[in-house]
């Protein structure tokens, strides 16, 4: 009789374990979340330039995930399988040996037009299931933004919440001695990269705000000691006056 009770109980445990494996997720509603071990393999390339872009993309993705506090990227030196191909399944056993719960890998290739194509995959290592597969085509200079977009896709798939890596920060940068401070409108990626100044510091600037499209910035500047509202186009660098205040 005891055996009849033990077997159903064991079956229930196995089913529960199978269910957990089928959906690898990070529950961010808990008070404390242990970072998920994840392997971010260098993206392969079809020439030296694309291979370098692939390494750079993987490094940015790993840094983004680690900075979120929800992921623990595994050191590349521990990887058993290297140069993971998109045309074949990963060797999941190799990744389980280093306790990687998830695997990110991809490839970078140049097209005849000069554009760069970036493909990536996200795998649940223990369930041996693909979780995300996407491809992006853009100019080579946009590789960092592609890395942020991929990071967002991984974050959303693993947590169910929208990612925030493909965002920019606009702020007022101050410099100079305390009695002659220079204030300039500045912008950068959320990780501090691609920093640039948008104004020259000749006029006092305050209260920058992104437009709903995130392509323009409104801000207040004192021109000849009179407040004036400007709108600045991030892509073109052009600005125009929206209004003056007496």
Regions found by a protein language model. Give the residues of each.
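Conserved beta-propeller blade repeats
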Residues: 143, 153, 157-160, 202-220, ...
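Structural motif
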Residues: 113-117, 178-186, 225-231
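Bacterial N-terminal signal peptides
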Residues: 5-17
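Short beta-strand->alpha-helix linker/helix-N-cap micro-motif
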Residues: 29-91, 104-110
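Beta-strand C-termini and the immediately following turn/loop, strongest in propeller blades
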Residues: 170-179, 217-224, 243
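Amphipathic beta-strand/beta-sheet edge segments enriched in Tyr/Trp
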Residues: 24, 86-153
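Short loop/turn segments that connect beta-strands within beta-propeller blades
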Residues: 126, 189-193, 233-237
């Amino acid at each position: 009789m005891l055996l009849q009770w033990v077997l159903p109980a064991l079956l229930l445990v196995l089913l529960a374990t199978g269910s957990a494996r089928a959906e690898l997720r990070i529950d961010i509603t808990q008070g404390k979340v242990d970072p998920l071990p994840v392997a971010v393999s260098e993206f392969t390339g079809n020439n030296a330039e694309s291979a370098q872009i692939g390494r750079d993309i993987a490094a940015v993705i790993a840094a983004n995930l680690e900075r979120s506090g929800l992921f623990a990227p595994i050191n590349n030196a521990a990887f058993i399988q290297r140069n993971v191909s998109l045309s074949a399944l990963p060797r999941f056993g190799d990744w389980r040996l280093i306790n990687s719960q998830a695997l990110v890998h991809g490839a970078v290739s140049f097209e005849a037009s000069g554009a760069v194509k970036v493909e990536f995959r996200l795998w649940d290592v223990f369930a041996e299931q693909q979780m995300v597969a996407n491809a992006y085509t853009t100019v080579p200079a946009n590789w960092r933004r592609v890395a942020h977009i991929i990071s967002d896709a991984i974050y959303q798939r693993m947590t169910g919440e929208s990612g925030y890596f493909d965002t920019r920060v606009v702020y007022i940068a101050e410099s100079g001695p305390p009695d002659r401070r220079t204030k300039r409108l500045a912008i950068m990626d959320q990780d501090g990269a691609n920093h640039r100044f948008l104004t020259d510091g000749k006029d006092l600037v305050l209260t920058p705000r992104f437009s709903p499209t995130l392509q323009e910035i409104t801000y207040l500047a004192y021109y000849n000691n009179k407040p004036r509202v400007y709108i600045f186009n991030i892509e073109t660098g052009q600005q125009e006056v929206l209004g003056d205040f007496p």
